[in-house]
Curated annotation (Swiss-Prot):
Binds 1 [4Fe-4S] cluster. This is Periplasmic nitrate reductase. The keyword Oxidoreductase applies. It comes from Shigella dysenteriae serotype 1 (strain Sd197). Its cofactor is [4Fe-4S] cluster; Mo-bis(molybdopterin guanine dinucleotide). Keywords: 4Fe-4S, Electron transport, Iron, Iron-sulfur, Metal-binding, Molybdenum, Nitrate assimilation, Oxidoreductase, Periplasm, Signal, Transport.
Amino acid sequence: MKLSRRGFMKANAVAAAAAAAGLSVPGVARAVVGQQEAIKWDKAPCRFCGTGCGVLVGTQQGRVVACQGDPDAPVNRGLNCIKGYFLPKIMYGEDRLTQPLLRMKNGKYDKEGEFTPITWDQAFDVMEEKFKTALKEKGPESIGMFGSGQWTIWEGYAASKLFKAGFRSNNIDPNARHCMASAVVGFMRTFGMDEPMGCYDDIEQADAFVLWGANMAEMHPILWSRITNRRLSNQNVTVAVLSTYQHRSFELADNGIIFTPQSDLVILNYIANYIIQNNAINQDFFSKHVNLRKGATDIGYGLRPTHPLEKAAKNPGSDASEPMSFEDYKAFVAEYTLEKTAEMTGVPKDQLEQLAQLYADPNKKVISYWTMGFNQHTRGVWANNLVYNLHLLTGKISQPGCGPFSLTGQPSACGTAREVGTFAHRLPADMVVTNEKHRDICEKKWNIPSGTIPAKIGLHAVAQDRALKDGKLNVYWTMCTNNMQAGPNINEERMPGWRDPRNFIIVSDPYPTVSALAADLILPTAMWVEKEGAYGNAERRTQFWRQQVQAPGEAKSDLWQLVQFSRRFKTEEVWPEELLAKKPELRGKTLYEVLYATPEVSKFPVSELAEDQLNDESRELGFYLQKGLFEEYAWFGRGHGHDLAPFDDYHKARGLRWPVVNGKETQWRYSEGNDPYVKAGEGYKFYGKPDGKAVIFALPFEPAAEAPDEEYDLWLSTGRVLEHWHTGSMTRRVPELHRAFPEAVLFIHPLDAKARDLRRGDKVKVVSRRGEVISIVETRGRNRPPQGLVYMPFFDAAQLVNKLMLDATDPLSKETDFKKCAVKLEKV
């Protein structure tokens, strides 16, 4: 067999991914494809990360039996990462939940009782009583929901409607708060609109790739295979990788940079200074399309107001800024000299200069990629703003092959959490609850009384934990997320609230996760192709899939759960009289009738489905629920830069990148000839801002919330590994992936281990000011920390590393810093 170069690169990428999991390529094929006769195939996006790879799902006799890369999918072109090849097995773990479970004692609910099987009606009976009691006694602020960037688009939309319009509570937030909130605020501050302006097609046209806190080789391996192909096929292409420790992406790096935690802010300002000092500003672009502003500083760390760091902050939580001149900006970044930067970061001068030269060279098309290294950062918004500065100074933006690109970690952190607006402060299409005009638009479209949606921002993820602990949030429903394992400071700020007898906790999940086992009621959930769905990936690509099998037992989709539960409430039970008086025709109606079974949503008949097409929710209700919800939601974005295509178009396509105008998707936003919202002669227009100009921010270095000292003498950073996704609730139930990486380890520099009389394979106690875990010493693995730093993945439920993490957040985005806290080690 003769392989083309492209085929050779793909084959090597598959082999590398398979080898990482201890499998041969034929072994992968045999494990997931099996016998293809009589298998029915249909398309779907992958269930895992935000890359949005397309897969072909094979079903047989009511089960998913096979999965392969979709050769027609433009994202991955037929290639899967190792997790993608094992997608069928995530659905059939031996401990899959199939019926609701309630803590009971002597036949009744008891907070200290044992989990006991009950019916869905019984589950909703208990939930109804708890919700109504909380609403009556303490009001809408006493209930809350924690959702997910893994929700389908219509699940997130239905949840947001139920809480913000139905229950009149903005206490709904997604787990994307922990991963993408800093990116969102960064986009909004700089451009006035969320999400990247570029797309994956940039990869094949770029001259340089700079990774800021992104281990794409393991976390976005399919995109990394495309970057690898570009780098190895073109000797003039350069790859720079910046991180606080060495990882697999360094294997391709021409310039691999290890910097002191938090000092990425220094490097970013140094590069801006270098660009100015070397007259590398694109003056035409800069003068026409950019404003300069100086941001507020000393903004705190998002901790409780009583924390000493918050008391000491001069401008806690401030996102204020003021205009500044170019001369003032030039003077501001001039402080970040090469010498000072090298001293503060620990990076050799020659490496810093090489990096800066990539951005300054007018002939180099540069893509900046980042993920959690930037976002999970107490100055994550600033880091996002500062990397935009580099592209705005040089004009390397919104054109093929160059631009800043924020990568996402979840399959629909963009499509659901961000675009739908399931954050505590957001509404669809970049609208926000604090804006009266935005609330009015939603209330009119939803045909609910004016004033229904609260103007006050609800509780964000970390604030929800604190409110539960303080007894202020009393009924809490989490869906499609495992926050007891994934969130910070488990011992001090999360577990106390979940187990507080004042509070009732509901967890909807397919498996008995750490979160489920800490709850009071567990609802069994349909997953992936057991329901019809839609995700939006990192490049603004919206992708649909059909329901292909039915969920086991009594498991139901999150959408079904939300819609059916809404039947339990009448408007008089959730809205005050002054609202009902504005729309008396809504009296006596259930929230189901007001929010979901409306003429707008229910107008698409179930007959639009093919006779043999599964769709459990729509067939039960008698109308095409998913289509109705999507078309209502899509209305919000059409006409002002967030345009989604008609519903039916997505079932025909392998995804479309918004804005989709006149049937054509958009690859590059904000530039003439690429974006339908930029008129001829405008060149560039950042139309999220009233004047069409993007903002360069002057923002300084500020230290981390916690750093090593004499007692807690090591930095701890947390993250993921190739074989497991997030908390491992799916991937650890795949035998092959579990065997490949069965338990978490503590990656440590050999000299740090030796100084503590530790050897590879030893058990070690990792201790912070908040908790401790026992792990296993690893001095040779794929991750190579420098002296003074240790790294630990968070997929292992037996090693809850987030017991150790401080619940410090970026004060602007409220996103947790999972990359930096101080620990000490004790030999076990």
